[in-house]
């Protein structure tokens, strides 16, 4: 068990000045118990905490570090920009054009793109744009999907909202809640029923094509195809939230993987290379409704800042040049197979879901295809599993309902260590 003396001291101090002692709820370890760990340094696939303990990292800053932490090319590019260009101007810069052009080349749905500062900003802006473009008010999302902390999305949401045990948030007005309609993931009939009940009122359907905030739940391809057909027939804007799965499950995201093209796409995480960033884009005739071309307002003081764009641009260049996706698939598949073999040895039959280098081990024997099946998972057992892995130097998400990210920086030795630790942790979790 790692000694966490300094982390415990810092957490006590933090609680005096920061609500709950953290700046994002899942970091508080409420669902797994114990002391939140304060990190001091990251390098490659490893993190070191303030007490000097080192961990093999499968959180990767919640997704951005597909190449690992402190990749030398990304770090060098950030340093060059910091020393030679600057941190922010509040004016247009050439880097904005370069990354926008590259994103439009990579992502199938993008004809135009707008940079913002977070995934939440991206999804909020995309929904506002869809409403402005269609002149309709209501949106459809899916139970358990998380699209950031905008008011419209905190109705039956996933991520930290689900981790806290309450999928809705106080502070969301009744009017907002009434305009947010929730369907069942992977169930096209539930979507059709809502559309028929709200004929001519639905502006957009927003979905994570690989849900990553209820654990990991892949959409069925036929479900996404049916959504595309329904949106075309009803004049509804289809939005893929690829903040998490974009550039991770494939270079062009889930829309490349599944071969289904949305009208709008939201992005983040990987395109910031570890710095705060987001983006939304899509069909030109929709994007042209954004100010200053159109009347749908969206703005940001630090949008398109040089540091974030530099980190994202260098990360994308590496992904294009080195094509790590076959190797990422091999590594993630090795872990999946190892975990499965361990469960077979122990007579366990827990559900594993994986798409590329995003994965989740659910402590339930129920196949997990939507929110209702996800919450059959035994969170108490996951808490025991989490702490056993932590004791063995493996850092996982401190919540059953988050993804495990494999990175290009994980070595075969790291993977073998993880499989061995998984066996011990499964034993500990099921005592």
Swiss-Prot record:
Residue numbers carrying N6-(pyridoxal phosphate)lysine: 269
The protein's Enzyme Commission number: 5.4.3.8
GO MF annotation terms: glutamate-1-semialdehyde 2,1-aminomutase activity; pyridoxal phosphate binding; transaminase activity
GO cellular component terms attached to this protein's record: cytoplasm
Protein name: Glutamate-1-semialdehyde 2,1-aminomutase
Subcellular location: Cytoplasm
Species this protein is from: Chlorobaculum tepidum (strain ATCC 49652 / DSM 12025 / NBRC 103806 / TLS)
Top-level taxonomy: Bacteria, Pseudomonadati, Chlorobiota, Chlorobiia, Chlorobiales
Biological process, per Gene Ontology: chlorophyll biosynthetic process; protoporphyrinogen IX biosynthetic process
Keywords: Chlorophyll biosynthesis, Cytoplasm, Isomerase, Porphyrin biosynthesis, Pyridoxal phosphate
NCBIfam families: hemL, PRK00062.1
SUPFAM superfamilies for this protein: PLP-dependent transferases (SSF53383)
Enzyme class: isomerase
